[in-house]
């Protein structure tokens, strides 16, 4: 949760620079994997094209980790099935809403309902991953 809060506390310029750096690294990695020799201008063009996707995948990934790390202990303490999804899902969705509200007070940032939906989808994915891991673990370990 601290990691999410820290990223949300970055100004629009700081956040944009960080996600653009990640976009450039992705383009360079894909260029190496496909044996493409990309010059600096091409890297910039391709990075601009995937920048939005990288930003939204970062939202999804942060909350996927939150969903996993929140639901795993709950699962271990026998909160399972519908109640696990409900409790962890509501907590994560509420935190996503508060996170977007927090961005109202950061320079150049604004809240977006789309981001809350993406965040919630990421956390629900993490929660269901916990359920799958738990189901497989019960069948093989215990």
Protein language model features and the residues they cover:
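Alpha-helical membrane-protein architecture signal
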Residues: 46, 50, 87-90, 114-117
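Small-polar-interrupted transmembrane alpha-helices in polytopic inner-membrane proteins
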Residues: 1-2, 84-103
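Membrane-interfacial alpha-helical segments at the cytosolic side of multi-pass membrane proteins
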Residues: 62-76, 121-137
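Interfacial helix-loop-helix junctions of multi-pass membrane proteins
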Residues: 96-120
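Membrane-interface loop-to-helix entry segments
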Residues: 52-66, 113-121
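"…centered on the first transmembrane helix and the immediately adjacent amphipathic helix/loop
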Residues: 1-62
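Short, charged juxtamembrane terminal tails flanking transmembrane helices
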Residues: 138-142
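Membrane-helix interface segments
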Residues: 77-86, 109-113
